[in-house]
Every structure is written in structure tokens, then in C-alpha cells.
Amino acid sequence: MGKMIYLDNAATTKTAPEVVEAMLPYFTEFYGNASTVYDFAANSKAAIAKGRQQIADVIGAKKEEIYFTAGGSESDNWALKATFEAYKNKGNHIITTKIEHHAILHTCEYLEKERGAKVTYLDVDENGFIDLDELQKAITPETILISVMAANNEIGTLEPLKEIGQIAHEHGILFHTDAVQAFGQIPINVDEFNIDMLSSSGHKINGPKGIGFLYIRKGVKIRSFVHGGAQERKRRAGTENVPGIVGYGLAAERANKSMKERTAKEIEIRDHMINRILTEIPYVRLNGDKVKRLPNNVNVSIQFIEGESLLLMLDNFGICASSGSACTSGSLDPSHVLLAIGLPHEKAHGSLRLTLSEEITKEDVDFVVEQIKAIVDRLRSMSCLLYTSDAADDL
């Protein structure tokens, strides 16, 4: 096997060398607990403050509105559970979508079963977009929160955050967005988009694992999620992960500075890959919108094959990809996202997600496409499905 070509950057990314270098002193040199009063802790306190500011700058927030967590899933749980508990006297209705990450969907299910919440799960169209008119119709006097992801982790669709936030605020409803995939990939301004809460995670932007944040707009009365000490202004207890915060702050700053140039390159390579796959492999459809999608996301459904078989054979060539989100790739169930956009089970099972990084070249993509073509031909020749033009449905 030659070099590895890593095309699963929606699952996680390689921590940038400069990020690792910045983190190291806070393991062995500046290791003081930031909650203590002696001078040795001053470096830790300063590092946390800097990381908080670096992240706030990316989304146009105030540094005191950034609360560090252990990752995107915790941030999503906090946003939904704590908001529900804080505002349940006003109402018990939450609006979200059928294509959210499981950190949102499973939290909503918990709130329904255990806390008496009523949740509306909005349908999406064939490209994964919500209907803003349907959102308006779903609002009731009991609605306290709208949670819609900024960018879908599987098909890359970019939801109309500004319009959603405007609708929410017109009705006096809080707006939360899961921006785990979008943060550092597309410009987001919390004031411009009327966002009250935003979740993100460090390891999606060449930062470390185990660190995330929840942006909470000043004035939002969200309750503490982890009880104990007085860290994070008494809203999230636990000794701060100083190395993680340092790394996350630098990764956020790095992603923001390189965003325009980096994403332009990713879009060029992404579109080249999409065009080759769609024109050179029959019975393939692109999942998600062709334009309003994450710069690095390619997701296709290939008829007459099983996606898991394709992944295993790609792995033999050193190509790392996914058939869906990493959180569900071990499951034989088809992606809930692909089912929500209208794909039947057999086509959802043939999905392939390829997510780029700044290190991926056009030559890498051309090599990958050639391997996909050869593997698809081989799998189709062995398929028990009738591979003829008469048997193929329109994708």
C-alpha cells in the first residue's frame, strides 16, 4: 500500500503541528490549575482568556459568551437540556429537523420521554434544506427553542441560518445551531445570523479532540449543565482543559485566517471530484445541493453496490472515506439523513462520503476516482442486483 489518502475530515482532522507545539508547554511547564490563586497559575488563566478571545473573534461574539466544553456533543446536550429546564415555564415545544446529528436527535428524544417536551422534526427537501414556510407554521405559543444545524455532517447542505434566526427572533424564540461542521469552514456571525447559542468542536478544524465550546448570547438564561466548581463563570464545572483550549484557540484563529484561500481550493477540488464521479460512473447521484454545501464535502449514492464493501476495498488502497457519519458507520442501518432526503433504503446503503482537507491535491482526487471506478465495476459484476439500464431507477 502506498501513501494514505485521508478523505474523512468530516469525522475528524489531523491536529496541525503548530497547534500541537503550542499545546505542549501547558502539559509540562505551565501546568497550574487556573482556579488557584498563586502566581504559577497566571499562565494558565492567561492562556484560557486568549483561547476564549480567539474563538469569539471567529463568530463575532464577546469572549465572555464562550463556554468551553468537552466537545460538540456536550455542547448540543447542554444547549437543549438546559434551555428546556430554564424556559419550561414559558413553554415546552422545541423545533428541530430530521437530519440533525444524533447529539441533537437523541437529546430531543430524551426530553420528550423524560421531561415532557414536545418536539417538531421538520422535513427537508431532496437536497436537505428546510422549508422556511413550514418552520413558520410549526411555531406555537409554547415554542421556546429552534435548533437547526448550520451544515449537515453527511451531505454538506448549508441551511439558511440568517433567515431561521430572523424567524425565531420575530417570535421571541431562542435559536441554537450545531455548527460543528461549519465553524472554520464558512463565515458565521452570531449577531448577523441572530444566533443565541452555537456548538462547535476542536477536532474538526485541525485542533485537539476532547475540547469544544458553546456560545451563549448574553442574557440567555441557560442553566448549568455540569455541577461542581465555579469554572466557566459557574456554568460548567470541572478543571479547565488548558492545553485543549490553547490548541482550540490557535486552530480557530488559523482556520479563520486561511478560510478564503483554503476553501476556494477545496471547492475547486471538490467540484472536480464530483464532476468526474457523476460523468464517469453510471447510476450515481450527488446528495446535497451542488452549490450551497460545505467546501470540502462530497457525498454520492452509487446504485447496485453496498457502501460498506466499497469502503473496505478503498481501504486496501490506503483511501479513508465514510458511508455516513462516523457516529453511525458501524451500523447496518441506512443513514437517517439520506432517508430524510427521500432515498430508498437500497440507494442509501450505496452512499459514499468523501471530505477533503487542505492537504488533498487534484492528483490525489484523480487517483481516488480511478480506484472508485474500478471497485464499483468489480462490485457490480458480483452484485445479486440486476445491473441493467432497465433495472436502474433514475437517481
Please report, for each region that a protein language model flagged, where it lies by residue.
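A short, hydrophobic C-terminal helix/tail in secreted or cell-surface proteins
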Residues: 390-395
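Pyridoxal 5′-phosphate
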Residues: 1-389
